[in-house]
A protein has these predicted regions:
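Well-ordered beta-strand positions
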Residues: 157, 197, 201-203, 209, ...
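C-terminal long alpha-helix characteristic of the crotonase
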Residues: 87, 160-165, 216-263, 276, ...
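Conserved CoA-thioester-binding segment of acyl-CoA-metabolizing enzymes
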Residues: 1-83
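Glycine- (often His-adjacent) and acidic-residue-rich active-site loop
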Residues: 48, 80-125, 175
């Protein structure tokens, strides 16, 4: 069976099925893995190196949020379709489409409600990736530049094409800057000096160089990239869902302030609700009696 030309050369149609209810997508594709709880969300504008416009971000957020709320999905693969029909180049995402950038952000097409114009809501996507209780893997087949570079940074893991992946922070070249996860969290990954080099010099790094500095988990032969990403997803999904969720929030907590504390503590509260002790507290309240805590030890 030939790969769907509207997906990607690396896409194996026997391994995936389209997610129901998303047939109207134009700028991304959204598929569910056959036989495991993983989804593939891909930028689908290869002719412009998978640059995003506001409509792209709307679709991306919608698919990611659907994956977040799907109870049997544990892993999200975020990638870019390709290659470009124009020149054969590959891209994960090259950031915001500068052709639609205005003074107040990135502009919707003509005819869209002006109240929605001038957006920088890819930052909302960053927060969704950061805070969703699922493991998000950036699968980078080509260029990850500018805002696309920041998206790979905020993902939990990154796999990259050894032959074609290129990492380049172009923000300062176009008078932009990611003052949040794209820079500060990058410094956590590669160190302050290296992160400043990446932003201030704007050089391109291949997969092996990015792996050596700690920004990439594995440099993978291009032809094997999606197969390996599915294997990683399968290994992740073989672990405890509760442990994975708590681990992600624990890793994030030190950098995320009170928001990180709330997310971790909220999950801990939900775990506490599952205990007999919590059931006793609830039942005593509903039965208008004093709770009997005598069965529950004071652990140390």
């Amino acid at each position: 069976m030939d790969a769907d030309p509207h997906v990607s050369e690396l896409f194996d149609p026997t391994a995936w099925r389209a997610v129901d209810g998303f047939g109207d997508l134009t700028d991304i594709t959204y598929h569910r893995a056959q036989g495991q709880g993983a989804v593939r969300i891909a930028f689908d504008r290869p002719e412009v190196r998978n640059a995003f416009r506001p409509h792209t971000v709307d679709e991306l957020y919608r698919a990611l949020d659907h994956a977040r709320m799907t109870p049997d999905v544990g892993c999200v693969l975020l990638t870019g379709n390709g290659p470009s029909p124009r020149d054969g180049g590959w891209a994960f995402c090259s950031g915001g489409d500068q052709r639609v950038r205005g003074r107040d952000g990135y502009r919707y097409a003509d005819g869209v409600d002006p109240a929605g114009a001038g957006r920088l809501h890819v930052l909302e996507v960053q927060r969704l990736i950061r805070f969703m209780p699922k493991v998000v893997i950036a699968v980078v087949p080509g260029w990850a530049a500018g805002g696309g570079h920041s998206l790979h940074v905020v993902c939990d893991l990154t796999l990259a094409s050894r032959e074609h992946a290129r990492f380049k922070q172009t923000d300062a070249d176009v008078a932009s800057f990611d003052g949040g996860f794209g820079s500060a969290y990058l410094a956590r990954q590669v160190g302050q000096k290296r992160a400043r080099e990446i932003f201030f010099l704007g050089r391109a790094y291949d997969a092996d160089e990015a792996h050596a500095m700690g920004a990439v988990n594995a440099s993978v032969p291009h032809a094997d990239l999606e197969r390996v990403s599915l294997q990683w997803a399968a290994e992740i999904n073989a672990k405890s869902p509760t442990a994975r969720r708590m681990l992600k929030f624990a890793f994030n907590a030190a950098d995320d302030g009170f928001v990180g504390q709330q997310l971790f503590a909220g999950e801990a509260t939900r775990l506490a609700y599952m205990t007999d002790e919590a059931a006793e507290g609830r039942d005593a309240f509903l039965e208008k009696r004093a709770p009997d805590w005598s069965r529950f030890p004071h652990y140390f």
